[in-house]
Amino acid sequence: MNIYEQLQAVEDRYEELGELLSDPDVVSDTKRFMELSKEEASTRDTVTAYREYKQVLQNIVDAEEMIKESGGDADLEEMAKQELKDAKAEKEEYEEKLKILLLPKDPNDDKNIILEIRGAAGGDEAQLFAGDLLQMYQKYAESQGWRFEVMEASYNGVGGIKEVVAMVSGQSVYSKLKYESGAHRVQRVPVTESQGRVHTSTATVLVMPEIEEVEYDIDPKDLRVDIYHASGAGGQNVNKVATAVRIVHLPTNIKVEMQEERTQQKNRDKAMKIIRARVADHFAQIAQDEQDAERKSTIGTGDRSERIRTYNFPQNRVTDHRIGLTLQKLDTILAGKLDEVVDALVLYDQTQKLEELNK
């Protein structure tokens, strides 16, 4: 099937979906209606671009016809030639756009994410930088109209973050933040440095798609659930009723503890969201490691410890090492203006996939 047959098939399916979504039997079946609505929405951009492309092809035919029928009218012929030139340029642009729209979609792109940030090498300074990254993602989420909820956080004595787990919810969150997983390195003079020397520290970021229970079923026999009293500052028990929850996935020894909420059930629900995402991510990473050819076509190696980005404060510079992008905009990027970085990563990924497709 060539690209035009693929596009026609997508348009035919889109029109079929439109009819199905107006069928009373489908409307009354909430689950099916939502599935079909999601499928229709996922193909809308492709169909719109394809229809515009077909109009451009018609414009080329019309312009060529006008040139033939100009009958010696120099002005009319000149106008038709300009229209033909413009339409041919548009045709090339649409063909590139349509190739990208037909690339295989990441099934997780529309999902919410669970975001984990940890201070790594560098002690207090690494944990302070982890806090800076948390604020950066919070501000970016706000600019995108997403909901950002801190689910669990552990702080050090100087205001830094040892570890934080957050849920980011909204439209296409994973598609934009999936490239953030990896080691983020910072170069700056710590507030505790009296000699003015630049130190290098690292924080790690992990982005996982939220996995619904119906998508990934964990056998209850593989889980150990412990209930205990939530503790406050200094380790004292703050609740008379045991509300804190610890869940361990026995086959992988992945563990989640949750005590942020006031009730045991809410802590359990949040812990299950996180452990489902971590376990699914664990096995997805194993599968990815086994697919060397596929890994070559993704940004970076896929190694979670891979250094992906450096934030150099003295030079106000951010460098993304995977795509060779350098921006002298560290202050604005840490203020949540991540669009330029995200767009460059998305474009690079699309380019790599197109090259794979054309081999």
From Swiss-Prot:
It is found in: Cytoplasm. Keywords: Cytoplasm, Methylation, Protein biosynthesis. Methylated by PrmC. Methylation increases the termination efficiency of RF1. Disulfide bonds: none annotated. It comes from the Bacteria. Residues 293-307 have a biased composition (Basic and acidic residues). One of its GO terms (cellular component) is cytoplasm. One of its GO terms (molecular function) is translation release factor activity, codon specific. The modification N5-methylglutamine is found at Q236. Pfam families: PCRF (PF03462), RF-1 (PF00472). Residues 288-307 are annotated as: Disordered. Peptide chain release factor 1 directs the termination of translation in response to the peptide chain termination codons UAG and UAA. Belongs to the prokaryotic/mitochondrial release factor family. HAMAP family: Rel_fac_1. This is Peptide chain release factor 1. It comes from Streptococcus gordonii (strain Challis / ATCC 35105 / BCRC 15272 / CH1 / DL1 / V288). The lineage of its organism: Bacteria, Bacillati, Bacillota, Bacilli, Lactobacillales. The gene is prfA.
